Amino acid sequence: MAIVSSVPLASKSCLHKSLISSIHKLKPFCRTIPTLGMSRPGKYVMPSMSMSSPVSDDGVQRRTGGYHSNLWNDDIIQFLSTPYGEPAYRERGERLIDEVKNMFNSISMEDVEFSPLNDLIQRLWIVDSVERLGIDRHFKNEIKSTLDYVYSYWTQKGIGCGIESVDPDLNSTALGLRTLRLHGYPVSAEVLKHFQNQNGQFACSPSETEGEMRSIVNLYRASLIAFPGEKVMEEAEIFSTKYLKEALQKIPVSSLSREIGDVLEQDWHTNLPRLEARNYIDVFGQDTKDTKLYMKTEKLLELAKLEFNIFQSLQKTELDSLLRWWKDSGFHHITFSRHLHVEYYTLASCIAIEPQHSRFRLGFAKACHVITILDDMYDVFGTIDELELFTAQIKRWDPSATDCLPKYMKRMYMILYDMVNEMSREAETAQGRDTLNYARQAWEDFIDSYMQEAKWIATGYLPTFDEYFENGKVSSGHRVAALQPILTMDIPFPHDILKEVDFPSKLNDLASAILRLRGDTRCYKADRARGEEASCISCYMKDNPGATEEDALSHINAVISDVIKGLNWELLNPNSSVPISSKKHVFDVSRALHYGYKYRDGYSVSNIETKSLVMRTLLESVPF
């Protein structure tokens, strides 16, 4: 069942209730796809920016995309020259890791720096710090022991700063709620009600002290990890957002003001761990006045900087491999499409920051780049007859039977064929079983959804919301962007786990839904200008005569908010039989692709925020 009914509802209020109630009943896309189609304004890649129809070299009249040129070429490797691959830096990093482990171990009742009045917040602080700095992978055992200790003192009113604190503390409770929930502990958001007055407002002082502002920062961060139906989390988000925005207008520029700005900018569902680490490095510990605490922050900061820069030496090797693949595959002959392989690799590097996940990073970049070319081929360049031939050949999966295809399609067929087979071999090595047929079916479903949309474009058909949305979740590309790359990781995905993170799981369905819905809100105007009418917005308006564009946008945004809460629950449900660590990779793919729509369609206009992301997380080292 799609989010919006195709039957016009009596009022906006009724429609909103219908949308909310259907969030947890989203029907996974069936492999049997109807014979209609449409444009992909909601995918994370956008179709043509031009309505021009020049005659190509083969004498066929074709549209062109009008995209800006590729921002990166082979010269990008020169910018990745870094000395941090030398053994001396790694050895220094290992020593710092041991010192930080000692910091974890020193937080005990016997340590003079801590007391029963502050030990809980100190424990939460160090866990939160290593996670935001992107170095937590070294301290999994220490983090688990620390959070077990904090959780053992958790109450229905939250926690105080220490185990002997008389009253609960907002900062400790908010940070504890967020951190414990992200690690799968069963903690209720109801604890926040104890910090509200009779009017539902969170208590705060007129003076707006630094300590209070940090408490509200953590309240805001906690509110983003809301589950469905948690009204107090919605109230916390509204209050903390208003409070922090107003505080930014009053306080002087400082590391605190920069941190507040970064936190407001980095919402949970577009937050990229490597970008968060890069931003947090710039503000971490700058205002620390306590000498002993300063020494701790300096060690954490040095390790974070080393880890960030050392990773760049690995990125250089991987990017060199990706550029060779791009050139050897003949992508430079494909002139009708965008080329975003560097941008996609950057996104992969921002979510899979552990060095051992090289195959994931490269596989994700390759899959997404192929998706982009196919998108432009189906939306812009290919004729309907050519596209039907290509779709049929994908189902045959036989490279010897492609003589019927035009030259450019033969090239794309072989690129897709070789890539899927290569990643299947890598997945077999990682998983110990053959997954080729599974991957082929995913790609067939995806290509079918593209073909369906191409037919909608060709016939001028505007589908109902249900028709559009069910097909659109598949054509969002989320599944094929995630499936094979995660299977190449050295993480076991047995069948019972895989079915809970891939099709037809609710996790996959919600992640695809968010990408479709958010993409449509960013791209529908450009699509309409190109003559591609169908989108969540236009289909909603068709199903609900009298609804304005603003009504549709408001409604879709409300639905996105609720779908996000549903995705939070699917990821973090403490009663789930699937480990968070298995689900998080699919969730992170959703975050990465969602990031491209954070400000605009960053996949068609990639020379602003997307370019900045490449510069900040791939090309620029952190200064010491």
UniProtKB/Swiss-Prot annotation:
Q: Needs which cofactor?
A: Mg(2+); Mn(2+)
Query: How, per the record, is the cofactor bound?
Result: Binds 3 Mg(2+) or Mn(2+) ions per subunit.
Enzyme class (EC, first level)? lyase
- The main place the protein resides is plastid
Establish whether keyword Nucleus is in the entry.
Answer: no
What's the short name of a Pfam family annotated to this entry?
Terpene_synth
State the reactions this protein catalyses. (2E)-geranyl diphosphate = (-)-beta-phellandrene + diphosphate
Give the UniProt keywords, A-Z. Answer: Chloroplast, Lyase, Magnesium, Metal-binding, Plastid, Transit peptide
Concerning SUPFAM superfamilies, the annotation shows: Terpenoid cyclases/Protein prenyltransferases, Terpenoid synthases
By what name is this protein known? (-)-beta-phellandrene synthase 3, chloroplastic
Please report the organism this UniProt entry assigns to the protein: Picea sitchensis (Sitka spruce)
